[in-house]
Regions:
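Short, solvent-exposed loop/turn segments at secondary-structure boundaries
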Residues: 98-99, 140-141, 155, 191-196, ...
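N-terminal Rossmann-like NAD(P)+-binding domain of SDR-like oxidoreductases, especially those catalyzing
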Residues: 1-183
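Short, surface-exposed alpha-helical segments at coil->helix boundaries
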Residues: 48-51, 164, 202, 261, ...
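Active-site proximal helix/loop that lines the substrate pocket
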Residues: 89-95, 132-135, 185-191, 221, ...
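CheY-like receiver
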Residues: 76-77, 117, 207, 235, ...
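Short-chain dehydrogenase/reductase
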Residues: 104, 153-161, 195-202, 226, ...
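C-terminal substrate-binding subdomain of Rossmann-fold SDR/epimerase-dehydratase oxidoreductases
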Residues: 1, 26, 32, 212, ...
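NAD(P)-dependent short-chain dehydrogenase/reductase
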Residues: 141, 168-224, 229-234, 238, ...
Length: 332
């Protein structure tokens, strides 16, 4: 299937959480395609936002330093937008278990605020909401798909599951034009590479860039999809361009299935520094590990003609080239 070039020129686009990893890369691409981009971001350090992420486009976009938990503020910014990408999220699995109320506020109440604002003030806008593969929990069949039941194992994943349902309920009850795109282990430029609180493979990249040990529990045999950021961004944009995806849930993941040990070793190889060490599982950690997590992308390929363009090796090379000149910007 031929994929048409997205039509974003002069479109008014709002990106909540636009200073974070996925949101900022989305902002760069939308600006490149001629859109009028507004970023709405509180810059909460727990969510991985970084003002340096918009270096190079800051003069061509608008940034509103506001909180999605403030209904009046988010309402003001949804009113005239053609497309809204909801990337605002507290993204740490571990933090969600330590501070569940914070995760509940951002990942559930924040989404309700956004949906209510859209319903009241701009019901014709196009909404793309980001979900996550961890909503599924331990997989009952593989490759899993959008019909797999959800058994989340942490508060973050549970709230992402609930917020996805909020989006679908509002779409069906109020005819909002929303789509959920679930992502899995996205890596690349502009990520939070300094902390294990965020995606494990981006943390691996940060360790390798500092020539440190990458620690893998057990033998690291658990299989994962890893998706380069440009592929994730292209999926999000394509999902906003057609009514075929309205009220749908789509997995946008890579075709590659690699073990955690393989991901660690390839990271060291392509970054050119660091080393991989294997240690016994910490007490209690193995009990919450979900094992293999292989996801199918057949639905999004069929509906949108989307397909990943970057393998992990190419993605790691591009990631290294991005971080090396500006590494200090990503380590607080």
């Amino acid at each position: 299937m031929r994929v048409a070039k997205p039509e974003l020129k002069n479109k008014k686009i709002l990106i909540t959480g636009g200073l974070g990893f996925i949101g900022s890369n989305l902002a760069h691409k939308c600006a490149e395609l001629g859109a009028q981009v507004t970023i709405f971001d509180y810059l909460d350090p727990r969510s991985g936002g970084n003002i340096y992420n918009v270096e190079g486009i800051r003069d061509s976009i608008k940034i509103a330093f506001h909180d999605i938990l403030n209904f009046d503020q988010i309402s003001e910014f949804v009113t005239d937008k053609d497309i809204i990408f909801n990337c605002a999220s507290s993204t740490s699995h571990a933090l969600s278990m330590r501070e569940p109320w914070i995760d509940l506020d951002i990942n559930s109440k924040g989404v309700i605020n956004l949906l209510e604002a859209i319903r009241r003030f701009n019901p014709q806008t196009r909404l793309v909401h980001i979900g996550t593969s961890t909503q599924l929990g331990k997989l009952r069949y593989q490759p899993s798909d959008e019909n797999h039941p959800e058994f989340p194992r942490d508060i973050y994943s549970a709230n992402k599951s609930v917020s996805e349902k909020y989006v679908l309920i509002y779409c069906r009850a109020y005819n909002l034009r929303g789509t959920v795109v679930r992502l899995s282990n996205v890596f690349g430029p502009r990520a939070s590479i300094h902390s294990p609180e965020f995606t494990f493979n981006n943390f691996f990249i940060g360790l390798a860039l500092q020539n440190k040990n990458i620690t893998v529990f057990g033998q690291g045999t658990q299989m994962r999809n890893v998706t380069y950021i440009d592929d994730a961004v292209s999926a999000l944009i394509l999902a906003s361009q057609t009514d075929k995806t309205e009220s749908e849930v789509l997995f946008a993941v890579s075709d590659e299935h690699l073990s955690i040990a393989e991901i660690a070793k390839l990271t060291v190889e392509h970054i050119g520094s660091g080393r991989v060490t294997f240690v016994d599982w910490p007490l209690g950690r193995k009990n919450i590990d979900i094992g293999d997590a292989i996801i199918s992308n057949k639905k999004i390929k069929k509906l949108l003609g989307w397909a990943p363009q970057f393998d992990i090796r190419t993605g790691l090379d591009l990631t290294k080239n991005y971080y090396q000149p500006c590494l200090e910007k990503y380590f607080p």
